Each structure stands twice: as structure tokens, then as C-alpha cells.
From Swiss-Prot:
Belongs to the EPSP synthase family. MurA subfamily. This is UDP-N-acetylglucosamine 1-carboxyvinyltransferase. Cell wall formation. Adds enolpyruvyl to UDP-N-acetylglucosamine. Its EC number is 2.5.1.7. GO terms for molecular function: UDP-N-acetylglucosamine 1-carboxyvinyltransferase activity. It comes from Pseudomonas putida. It comes from the Bacteria. Phosphoenolpyruvate binds at K22, N23. It holds the Pfam family EPSP_synthase.
Amino acid sequence: MDKLIITGGACLDGEIRISGAKNAALPILAATLLADGPVTVGNLPHLHDITTMIELFGRMGIEPVIDEKLAVEIDPRTIKTLVAPYELVKTMRASILVLGPMVARFGEAEVALPGGCAIGSRPVDLHIRGLEAMGAKIEVQGGYIKAKAPEGGLRGAHFFFDTVSVTGTENIMMAAALAKGRSVLQNAAREPEVVDLANFINAMGGKVQGAGTDTIVIDGVERLHSANYRVMPDRIETGTYLVAAAVTGGRVKVKDTDPTILEAVLEKLKEAGADINTGEDWIELDMHGKRPKAVNLRTAPYPAFPTDMQAQFISLNAIAEGTGAVIETIFENRFMHVYEMHRMGAQIQVEGNTAIVTGVKALKVPGNGHLRASASLVLSALVAEGDTLIDRIYHIDRGYECIEEKLQMLGAKIRRVPG
């Protein structure tokens, strides 16, 4: 497995382009199964989970075609099997997203219970209950969810999510797109990635309204047609590079992004002392060589502060002036990176779902020079004195396209070495 070697101390300065959002691309790829003709999806990030989803289609008999711009064409009419096997699903929880589209379009599906990232418990109950509300018969046996649509297909339903679930909202919304009648999803997830999926369904001729609010209304249609669609930019990648510049006292301009989907993060960066300017598809951050100020934050579902940016802000607070409290309300076990930061001299006290971080002037390379991988630790290594070796970077590669190349473009001293 590859490793990253980072020499801290460089002040980042430059411009980079933001990749497509993995968390929008995966449900959009799943939704191509709803169409009755070929669909082309562009701006896909080159990440392991995207490759796994495309491989899953291959196992089902669909042969994805990739063009010179790395857009992928999927023709669901060539599907030969309605089974998503365990050996692929276990590596990626998002595989569950093919369940709703397959039941809606083909009348049945068999999807292995997912594995993937080990953050807390993420039950698939909401997906199952939502499909049952639409008339599907579902059994869970032998590690597989086996679903069958009723005679005449899925029926529109009113469904209330008792906890906000992004993938649950997406799965039921996709199924409802081809169901008979109207579906109303209440307490739905409001994330921009849900909106992007709704826009994609509508681009194929669907009738989805209210995405981005907590009530989504879907009027089922008889068929969804071919479309050409470009995936939205990745807001977490955007935020991570902005924080990278902030912790080093530097300047960065991120292009091909969308400032409107990152307002909670930009607000906290301003609190930390950053000067921020935005355009339609770019954000510029400048710290003017200053050390950031510590910030308090609480994660919550969109449009509040995203849980996927929490660790990066702990890295920021760790070298900031003052003390900041970070409260995690979404996932359990989301402070696993803190132990590694302690080894770098960070002053962090964890009490339940809260991390109290008191900034120090400088972080140091840990005793043996090694850290377990996470994007937040890459940020910490950028400001540590000396060379830090980050191993097990599989998890970074799952979420970030070409992280070392983009950081090099900003002046970071970072290189990838074979494991």
C-alpha cells in the first residue's frame, strides 16, 4: 500500500481545480439504471468507489463505455443479472443505492448487505421500510436484501424518515421516480448531493420537486429517457484545500467549485481569520501569513456544518490561537484521528461527542515518523516540523483524487512512495 511523505513548513500558495463529488456521482450512477436508454455521466472523480460501482455494473452484464474525457456511458438495457454480489458490496456501502432503481425499473433486486467505512452504525432499515411502503416485498436472508415489486410495479407512498438519511432519501427518491402515483418523502435529507440526484432524474424526464428541503414530492412517470449529465463539484474536497491553505498561513484559489454549497464552512474560516472572496465557480482564501484563530463548531445535517469537515477543523484548531470546542452529532467514532494528533503534540481532550482543542504554536513529527492515514493528518503534517510518513493511505485515496499532485501544485513538499 502506498505511503505519503510530507515535509512540513511550506506556506501553500496557488490555484487548483476541484473534482466531481463522489457522494453525488455514486447515486447518479445508480440512477442510470432507471433509464430506458444510454445515459452519459461526466465530471466523475477518479476514485476507488467510482471504479467499484462501474465494476458492479459490469458484473450485472452492463458494459460501461468511457470516452476520451473520462465520461461514462451506461446502457441499462443490457443488464443480465439483478444481483449485487457481496464481494463488491462489502467494500462500498453506497452499493445499496442500486436497490431502489433495480426494484423500480426491473421489478426485483438482490443486494448484499453493505460493508465499507467503519464509522458507527449505519442501518439500512430506512431503505427497506421505504420500499415496503411502496408495496415491495422484502426478505433479508443469507446476508442479502431480496426485494420484489408488487404486481403492476411500485406504488407512490408517503414516507417519513425517523432519522435523516442521505442514502435512504436517495434510494427511495429513485424508486419513486418510476412508481405509480405521487410519493412524498418527509424529513428528507437536504444535502446538495440529493439535489444533484433530483436534477439528474429530472434531466431524464422525472418529476421531482422540493429537493434541498425536508419534503420531497415525486410524481412517478412511466419511463425515464437518455440524458447527458455533469456531476456537481466536491464540497468536502473544496473545504479541505481551503483549510490546508489556512493552517499554513497561505493563499489558495479553488476553481470549478460552488461557494453556495459550502457556506457553513466558509463562515468558520472567516471566524478563523481568513479573507475569503468568491465568484460563481471559485473561492479564494488568503491568511496573509497569519496563524488562524480557534473556532467552535457543531456538526449537523446540511445546511449546518458538515461532519466530513470536522477532522480538518480539529487540525486547524490544533495549531490555532486559543481553544475551540468541536461537537460531533452525526456519527459515533469520529475522533479516531485524535490519538495520532496527540503523538504530534496536539492538545486535545475528548469528552463523549466533544473534542476540546487548545492550539499549540507548532506540531512535531511523531516518534517513529509514521501516522495512520486521514486527510486531516495530511493537513497536520503540512505544518509539522520535519518529515512525516503517512501510511495506509487507502482511505485518503477513497475520498480525494490525486491529493499529493494538487498539494504539490500549491507548493507543498509531499510525495507518494510505494508501500
